Amino acid sequence: MKKILTTPIKAEDLQDIHVGDVIYLTGTLVTCRDVCHRRLIELKRPLPYDLNGKAIFHAGPIVRKNGDKWEMVSVGPTTSMRMESFEREFIEQTGVKLVVGKGGMGPLTEEGCQKFKALHVIFPAGCAVLAATQVEEIEEVHWTELGMPESLWVCRVKEFGPLIVSIDTHGNNLIAENKKLFAERRDPIVEEICEHVHYIK
């Protein structure tokens, strides 16, 4: 059975979700990456859209005009770690509950998710066209002067995913934990290989 989060998301909706879980999103998803984060955190410019209880997507979409509406063509995830220095404050200031992106994030985001009850989730890379099919409608767009990839595209989505939980509200970080685990497994293997190839200069 699918675990589907629907916006507006509340803290209690997230308490039983853990790293490694696969979830889906229905409701509001707003594309929001580097420049929007900088505007809010560094320049202290308020966002033109209320993200409280909503979800953001680290993504630079391709959209096209269809009559008087915008249509999503492709929307693939951007590397989330680019937003690491801003994300904790961003979560605190906006009340956003779901941060969607590519790859993991670090200790600042981990702290923000635990303290302010949010999740970071990973959307599979290479599936930008699939993601676009899960966007039912682009409802609004803001900060268009930043260009298509950096604008805030307010999308209505249905069962958007799959989304793999990488940071949960309990302070667990799937990618960081996996790095430690893989390093522990790697070291004895490397030592064994070195014993067999020590003669190679």
From Swiss-Prot:
Induction, as annotated: Induced by tartrate, via TtdR.
Entry-linked InterPro entries: Fe-S_hydro-lyase_TtdB-typ_cat (IPR004647), Fe-S_hydroAse_TtdB_cat_sf (IPR036660)
EC category name: lyase
Keywords attached to this entry: Lyase
EC numbers, comma separated: 4.2.1.32
Domain of life per record: Bacteria
Transmembrane segments: none
Catalytic activity: (2R,3R)-tartrate = oxaloacetate + H2O
Keyword check for Lyase: yes
Residues annotated as catalytic: 37
Entry GO MF terms: L(+)-tartrate dehydratase activity
Pfam family, one: Fumerase_C
Family: Belongs to the class-I fumarase family.
Subunit structure: Heterotetramer of two alpha and two beta subunits.
Protein name per its UniProtKB record: L(+)-tartrate dehydratase subunit beta
Naturally occurring in which organism (per UniProt): Escherichia coli O157:H7
Taxonomy of the source species: Bacteria, Pseudomonadati, Pseudomonadota, Gammaproteobacteria, Enterobacterales
